Amino acid sequence: MRPTILTFNLNENRLSKLRFLCMKLGLAVKAVPTEDFCQPISALCGMTEPVEAAPAEGFPEELLIFCHMDNAAVNRFLQTAKQMRYAPVALKAILTPTNAEWTPAQLCRELKDERAAVMRGETTHEE
């Protein structure tokens, strides 16, 4: 599958700049419309078929999900974004077997909870 970045809640200007950045790196960008927020992330990145689902809760935060990308590709993206002075997106995740079954809102909540725990100096998962 082609390396893809799923985007959520980016305004048109931010999305346009991100598309340019990703074009330089050979990455696809998929802006996920709010009506698809009910889908599992696996369906949004093309791993599974879409499901019949009730409308999902939205969220206002910007979110990026790196799909079908290894750590080196994610790091290249982050370095290039910094070099191009692309304003950071606070919430980012790499697709995993666990989060693939979540909706974007579930992932957003988890990322915000993890971020808050780190700010408090706590660990977020059992070791």
Where are these regions (language model features)?
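Short, intrinsically disordered low-complexity segments
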Residues: 37-65
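Short, structured motif recognition centered on aromatic/hydrophobic residues
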Residues: 4-7, 22, 59-67, 77
